[in-house]
């Protein structure tokens, strides 16, 4: 199940009794994995917690992995986190999961619609096209369905393909699909690689489509991907986002979660130097828009910074 493992181990001279945690992230072609590795490094170096970062199938797998005790930390989409807590949508069959808590919101996860087909200028142009919409019941899948529905389309109006970010990029290059939904922090490695050697571009998700989405679902907000984010991108692209969120097992100790929260937010500049998404780390962003309770350890840290968050 775990395709790739990145161990952020304590040095040999470190304490043998250090807390050990495994962090579930996402595919290696997305932002979660690389960013998770950076966070794991700072949690190890500054909090003394031995973190192993693993590549997974993403948000739902990370929530279920924490529930099963396989992971203690995970990066998730804010909307999928809410589905797990409520037992809705992607968790409707499996049931609700309440064995996790929020550490912090991390960064905007852009819903990126990428194509190499010059005929595709709007979401409506996807009708009849072969489109990758993520794994069934994944966060990406539901984001894609929401966008399609807001544009007056359904899953049956497209030739749906269910692929990972990396597989979607390869399929676009090989002409096997016409477009792909990729939900991740921009720049996303899979899209960066694709645009480096191919004439690919992002399709805006704006206007009436974005307005409909935001009116029907509180998780979505508008976001602008700046010109120059990807090779050949000469203009800003407006889209929608959800929020990448770090969660932790509810059973983790208050002291450990306090220390790992401090390790992240006391080192924002250094983290940003290693991964550009670190620039979005802030107390305000970390604590706003969360629909699931915070862990007491994270709440303690944010309270010291003047922000009180709900823990139940």
Tell where the protein language model's regions lie, with residue ranges.
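Pocket-lining segment of extracytoplasmic ligand-binding domains
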Residues: 78-80, 87-91, 155-246, 252
């Amino acid at each position: 199940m775990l395709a790739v493992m990145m161990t952020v181990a304590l040095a040999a001279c470190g304490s043998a009794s250090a807390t050990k945690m495994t962090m579930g992230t996402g595919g290696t072609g997305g932002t979660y994995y690389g960013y998770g590795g950076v966070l794991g490094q700072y949690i190890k170096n500054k909090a003394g917690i031995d973190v192993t970062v693993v590549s997974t199938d993403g948000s739902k797998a990370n929530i279920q992995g924490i529930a099963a005790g396989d992971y203690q930390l995970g990066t998730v989409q804010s909307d999928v986190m809410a589905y797990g807590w409520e037992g809705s949508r992607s968790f409707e069959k499996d049931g609700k999961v309440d064995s996790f808590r929020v550490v912090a919101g991390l960064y905007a996860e852009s819903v990126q619609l990428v194509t190499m087909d010059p005929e595709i200028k709007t979401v409506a142009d996807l009708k009849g096209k072969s489109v990758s919409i993520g794994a069934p019941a994944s966060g990406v899948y539901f984001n894609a369905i929401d966008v399609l529905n807001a544009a007056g389309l359904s899953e049956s109006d497209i030739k749906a393909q269910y692929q990972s970010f990396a597989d979607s990029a390869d399929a676009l290059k090989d002409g096997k699909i016409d477009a792909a939904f990729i939900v991740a922090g921009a720049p996303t490695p899979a899209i960066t690689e694709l645009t480096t050697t191919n004439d690919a571009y992002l399709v805006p998700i704006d206007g009436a489509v974005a307005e409909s989405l935001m009116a029907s679902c509180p998780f979505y907000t508008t976001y602008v991907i700046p010109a120059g984010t990807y090779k050949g991108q000469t203009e800003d692209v407006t889209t929608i986002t959800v929020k990448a969120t770090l969660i932790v097992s509810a059973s983790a100790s208050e002291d450990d979660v306090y220390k790992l929260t401090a390790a992240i937010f006391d080192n924002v500049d250094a983290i940003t130097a290693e991964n550009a998404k670190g620039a979005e780390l802030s107390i305000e962003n970390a604590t706003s828009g969360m629909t699931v309770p915070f862990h007491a350890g994270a709440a303690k840290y944010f309270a010291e910074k003047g922000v009180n968050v709900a823990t139940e």
